[in-house]
């Protein structure tokens, strides 16, 4: 989920993380009882036009059983529209392009006619800082089950340990390997 982006106004500005947190708190929720979820996967879509790949680019919508996600299935996850973070890293190493959407503080990637939205280390750091700023009760990571714990580009358990250690100790940036440093077998 992105942070506030000007094009969110098309949906009444209610689809970004800040609005959601502000709304819960305004309605009386205790921030210390709210947890922020972080994703170790991305949702992908088939672009209508591979040359038009920006934020909210037109995509083919196909119901795959868990939502309208029409991107190609991952090599390991094998579900259309669902890519584990290590599969996204593999695609980036094989020619996909990562784009940082500064306004939303999130990345997306595109290649082979597909588009995927996901979190990377930079966006996760930003969300951890946001959780600290709002005084949230904690963080939740979904899911370690999609890490292969053997050949992945980024061992997600390392990310999780650094993430939670940093949150608990109010430490600085998460420090781990990025996608460019390891290869899938």
Language model feature labels by segment:
Residues 20-27, 127-134, 183:
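Structured segments of extracytoplasmic/periplasmic soluble domains
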Residues 88-91, 130, 145-185:
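Aromatic-rich peripheral "rim/lid" segments of glycoside hydrolase catalytic domains that contact
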Residues 41, 123, 146-147:
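Conserved beta-strand elements of beta-rich interaction domains across eukaryotes
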Residues 1-83:
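Substrate-binding surface in catalytic domains of secreted glycosidases
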Residues 69-135:
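Hydrophobic, secondary-structure "cap" segments at the distal end of domains
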Residues 13-20, 120, 124-127, 153, ...:
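Stable alpha-helical elements in mature extracytoplasmic
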Residues 36, 131, 139:
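Conserved, mostly hydrophobic/aromatic
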Residues 5-12, 21-22, 111-121, 140-145:
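Active-site rim elements
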